[in-house]
Regions:
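Generic start-of-chain signal for non-secretory N-termini
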Residues: 1-19
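Ordered core of a single globular domain
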Residues: 16-29
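Structured beta-strand/loop patches that form or line metal/cofactor-binding pockets in enzymes
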Residues: 41-69
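Short beta-strand elements
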Residues: 61-67, 73-82
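ATP-dependent carboxylate/acyl-activation modules
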Residues: 82-92, 98-125, 142, 146, ...
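Rossmann-like flavin
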Residues: 128-136, 154-159
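Conserved small/polar residues in nucleotide/adenosyl-binding loops
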Residues: 166-167
Length: 167
């Protein structure tokens, strides 16, 4: 079995149920296969692919916030800090009911490559929550976002993580 195939198999085994992440890793590894195979011993010794496919850190946290009826709601949130080899983690936030760790790992993994092409000293990451802004009042969205950032601020800093928001 080739080094690329071994690493992909390990990703699948160590990250069960994360189909989105598996697919992103497979596509990247497949595109690198010829280059990696030609220099397999060198890359294997450096554990290049293992370092490429494993996030540096995944932060999982809860976000309590109060809706317009005075009810406390709690959402699940994540920040995947994938790779800081060339600079602070950079990647947006996604708020959607389908957000889960697999989706954010997939997006953070791809963000590493996207950011590396800018020529700027920034790494890759992604964050988000299963919060659904659809049908929420402006006050509810603001309450959620303020709580999200309060909780996230415990784990990030100016030299560590550069968060951007897109919707």
């Amino acid at each position: 079995m080739s080094y690329v195939d071994e690493v992909y198999e390990r990703v699948v085994n160590q990250n069960p149920g994360e189909a989105e992440f598996h697919q992103a890793v497979k596509e990247v590894l497949d595109s690198l296969k010829l280059v990696i195979d030609a220099n397999e011993e060198k890359y294997r010794k450096m554990a290049l692919l293992e370092r490429l496919v494993e996030p540096e850190r995944i932060i999982s946290f809860r976000v309590p916030w109060v809706d317009d009826k005075g009810q406390v709601q709690v959402n699940k949130a994540y920040r995947v800090q994938f790779n800081s080899a060339i600079g602070p983690y950079k990647g947006g936030l996604r708020f959607h009911p389908t957000v889960n760790q697999s989706i954010l790992k997939f997006l953070g993994f791809e963000q590493v490559f996207k950011n590396s092409l800018t020529g700027l000293p920034i790494g890759g990451g992604k964050g988000g929550s299963n919060f659904d802004p659809k049908g929420k009042s402006d006050r509810e969205v603001m309450a959620f976002c303020q709580s999200f950032m309060t909780e996230l601020s415990k784990y990030i800093g100016a030299d560590t993580d550069a968060v951007s928001y897109t919707h």
